[in-house]
């Protein structure tokens, strides 16, 4: 995925605010052996780009000053309530340097699993992306996970996922987060309290005389 960036000379809160007013988003490119570069990107183009899954987990081709740079999105700061990107960070990609990146997870087969089809269970996607470690050339666009074998009482953890070659899950020590949980659906039974009738009240109603009819007008 490609995008165009421009070098910017000024930095600081005031300069960034003025830049946003003109429809530009300030950013930075860092990493590798080169010095960090301050950049600016057209906000409209950036706003459309961030809506695409590939912009968040794939190697991006950034055109800067007529030169193409391979980068990864590292941070995205949004305005608290406006539809505005306040600042964006990219990291340079070096072919021989192993990287840690977040990759989206695509689930399938859930509706055909015994857990859903016959065991009346609720399947919850606890994590929808996975942090992996690999070389830039091996970064997958997404990780496919088949949930067709899920059964009642069985959860799927990060270390259960079969990853592509040369790609490893980036988890620390014995940590093994749950990716998918399976919970039995418990149907709540609402008990209706029986209506208690007072015998005396019922007898009184039965013996009550009907109301007298009004006299006819002459």
UniProtKB/Swiss-Prot annotation:
Gene3D superfamilies: Ribosomal protein L25, beta domain, Ribosomal Protein L25, Chain P. InterPro entries: Rbsml_bL25/Gln-tRNA_synth_N, Ribosomal_bL25/Gln-tRNA_synth, Ribosomal_bL25_b-dom, Ribosomal_bL25_C, Ribosomal_bL25_long, Ribosomal_bL25_short, Ribosomal_L25_dom, Ribosomal_uL5_bac-type. GO terms for molecular function: 5S rRNA binding; structural constituent of ribosome. GO terms for cellular component: cytosolic large ribosomal subunit. Disulfide bonds: none annotated. The keyword Membrane does not apply. GO terms for biological process: translation. Keywords: Ribonucleoprotein, Ribosomal protein, RNA-binding, rRNA-binding. The keyword Zinc-finger does not apply. HAMAP family: Ribosomal_bL25, Ribosomal_bL25_CTC. Belongs to the bacterial ribosomal protein bL25 family. CTC subfamily. Part of the 50S ribosomal subunit; part of the 5S rRNA/L5/L18/L25 subcomplex. Contacts the 5S rRNA. Binds to the 5S rRNA independently of L5 and L18. This is Large ribosomal subunit protein bL25. It comes from Polaromonas naphthalenivorans (strain CJ2). The lineage of its organism: Bacteria, Pseudomonadati, Pseudomonadota, Betaproteobacteria, Burkholderiales.
